[in-house]
C-alpha cells in the first residue's frame, strides 16, 4: 500500500500535516490539549515519493493504524526530516502516537528557522514566501479555495475547513506543501554552505526537540488560587472605582479621556492637551502626578490589567489539567532571543512590589524542585555598542568605554539622558528597535 522501501532509501523526507485545529488562533495549537485532531499527513522525499495520507477527514480516509505504522517506520529510520513550522507538525504527529517523537539524536530541520539565519531582516517566512523566493513558485491554492468557498461560503478559511472536504480535493494541495518544503530546504542548504553557517544551523535545529519537550510538558499553575485571587482583585478594583466615582460625583471610565476629564475638572486639577486640543491623560503623565484622582486611575488600570491579562487570559483561560503550555519561538526576534506566545510567559509581572509576587506565586515548580532565574545583562545593547564602536561613532565609543569600566553601565539610562525622556520610555523604544519594530 505504501512505498515504504523506497521511502527508507531516501536521504531527506519532508513532512507536513493537515489538521482540525479549532482554537489555534485563540489558544495556540490544540495537539497538547487534545483539542481537535490530525486530518492527514503528506510526505515528499528526495527520491521521488510524494503522497498524502488522510486519516481524519469526514469521509474517504485511509486505515489510521496503517498510516501510523508507516510514520513509525519513517521516524525509526532516523532519516533527515524536513518541516515548515516543525513544532506545530511534531506536536500533532504525537497525537497519533507518542513514539512519533524527535530527540537530540534526530536530524530535524525547519525551513522557517533556517531562513532567519540566512536573512534576519526578511521577516516573511511563510512557505509561500519562501517558495516564491527560492523556487519562483507559489502554492497552488485556486482549486481548494474554490471548493471551500462553494461548500462553506466565501468567507470560509481554507485551513479551518480542509478536514471537512473529501481527501481527493485536498491531496494535491497537501502534496504540494511537502514538495515545496523539501525543494526550499535544498536551496537553503546550498546557501548555508556558501555562507559557512552550518554550525549555527545545526545548533538552532537541535533546539527543536528541546522546545517540543518544553511545550508538551508545560508549567504547573495554581488554578484554584488564581481564581480566588481574580475575585479578590476584582473586589479591590471595584472599591477603587467607587472612591473615584465619589470624588468625581459621577461614574468615571478610566479608559476614556472624555470621562476622565470630568473627574479632573471636578477637582480643578490641570491637565495636558494634544496638538488638536483634546484632553490628554497618558500613562507617563499620570505616573508623575501626586493627586488622588491620578492615583485612583492608575490603581484601577493596574488591577484591571493584572486580573484580565495575567490571571484570566494567561492562567484561567489557558490552563489544561493544571498546566499552561506556552509556545517558545526560537527565531521570534531579529537578535535571536526567544519570543513566546499562548501565553507569553516572558511577560509575567516582576516589578510591582505588591502584585508581582502574587502573580508569580501562581506558577509552580515541579515537585521537590525550585525555580532558577538567570538572565543576560543588556545583551542586545552590548552587541549594538560593540558593532557601532567598530564604525568609530563617538557616542558608541563612549558607551563601549563605559561598559569596559563599569559592568553595571545602564545603556537605557544613557539613551534616556541623551533624549531627555524617562528611562522606561527609552527602554521600550530601544527594545522595540532591537527586536525588529
Q: What are the residue ranges of the model-derived segments?
A:
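Conserved "right-hand" nucleotidyltransferase catalytic core of DNA-directed polymerases
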Residues: 1-55, 122, 133-135, 142-355, ...
Amino acid at each position: 500500500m505504501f512505498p515504504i522501501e523506497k521511502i527508507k532509501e531516501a536521504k531527506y523526507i519532508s513532512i507536513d500535516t493537515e489538521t482540525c485545529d479549532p482554537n489555534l488562533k485563540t489558544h495556540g495549537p490544540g495537539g497538547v490539549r487534545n483539542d481537535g485532531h490530525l486530518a492527514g499527513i503528506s510526505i515528499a522525499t528526495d527520491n521521488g515519493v510524494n503522497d498524502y495520507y488522510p486519516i481524519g477527514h469526514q469521509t474517504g480516509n485511509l486505515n489510521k493504524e496503517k498510516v501510523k505504522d508507516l510514520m513509525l517506520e519513517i521516524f525509526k529510520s532516523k532519516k533527515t526530516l524536513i518541516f515548515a513550522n516543525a513544532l506545530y507538525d511534531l506536536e500533532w504527529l504525537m497525537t497519533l502516537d507518542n513514539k512519533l517523537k524527535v530527540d537530540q539524536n534526530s536530524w530535524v530541520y525547519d525551513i522557517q528557522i533556517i531562513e532567519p539565519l540566512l536573512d534576519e531582516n526578511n521577516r516573511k517566512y511563510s512557505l509561500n514566501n519562501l517558495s516564491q523566493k527560492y523556487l519562483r513558485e507559489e502554492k497552488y491554492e485556486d482549486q481548494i479555495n474554490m471548493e471551500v468557498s462553494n461548500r462553506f461560503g466565501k468567507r470560509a478559511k481554507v485551513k479551518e475547513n480542509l478536514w471537512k472536504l473529501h481527501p481527493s480535493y485536498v491531496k494535491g494541495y497537501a502534496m504540494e506543501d511537502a514538495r515545496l518544503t523539501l525543494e526550499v530546504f535544498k536551496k537553503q542548504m546550498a546557501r548555508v554552505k556558501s555562507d559557512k553557517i552550518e554550525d549555527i544551523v545545526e545548533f538552532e535545529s537541535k533546539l527543536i526537540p528541546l522546545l517540543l519537550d518544553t511545550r508538551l510538558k508545560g508549567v504547573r499553575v495554581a488554578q484554584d488560587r488564581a481564581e480566588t485571587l481574580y475575585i479578590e482583585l476584582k473586589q479591590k478594583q471595584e472599591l477603587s472605582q467607587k472612591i473615584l466615582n465619589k470624588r468625581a460625583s459621577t461614574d468615571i471610565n478610566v479608559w476614556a479621556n472624555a470621562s476622565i476629564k470630568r473627574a479632573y475638572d471636578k477637582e480643578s486639577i490641570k491637565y495636558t492637551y494634544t496638538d488638536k486640543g483634546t484632553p490628554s491623560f497618558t500613562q507617563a503623565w499620570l505616573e508623575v502626578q501626586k493627586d488622588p484622582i491620578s492615583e485612583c486611575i492608575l490603581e484601577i488600570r493596574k488591577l484591571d490589567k493584572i486580573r484580565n491579562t495575567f490571571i484570566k487570559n494567561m492562567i484561567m483561560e489557558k490552563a489544561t489539567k493544571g498546566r499552561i503550555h506556552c509556545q517558545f519561538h526560537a527565531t521570534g526576534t531579529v537578535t535571536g532571543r526567544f519570543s513566546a506566545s499562548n501565553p507569553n510567559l516572558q511577560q509575567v509581572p516582576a516589578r510591582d512590589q505588591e502584585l508581582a509576587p502574587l502573580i508569580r506565586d501562581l506558577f509552580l515548580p515541579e515537585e521537590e524542585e525550585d525555580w532558577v532565574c538567570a538572565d543576560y545583562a543588556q545583551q542586545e545593547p552590548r552587541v549594538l555598542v560593540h558593532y557601532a564602536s567598530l564604525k568609530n561613532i563617538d557616542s558608541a565609543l563612549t558607551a563601549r568605554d563605559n561598559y569596559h569600566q563599569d559592568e553595571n553601565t545602564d545603556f537605557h539610562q544613557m539613551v534616556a539622558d541623551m533624549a531627555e525622556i524617562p528611562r522606561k520610555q527609552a527602554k521600550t523604544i530601544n527594545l522595540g528597535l532591537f527586536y525588529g519594530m
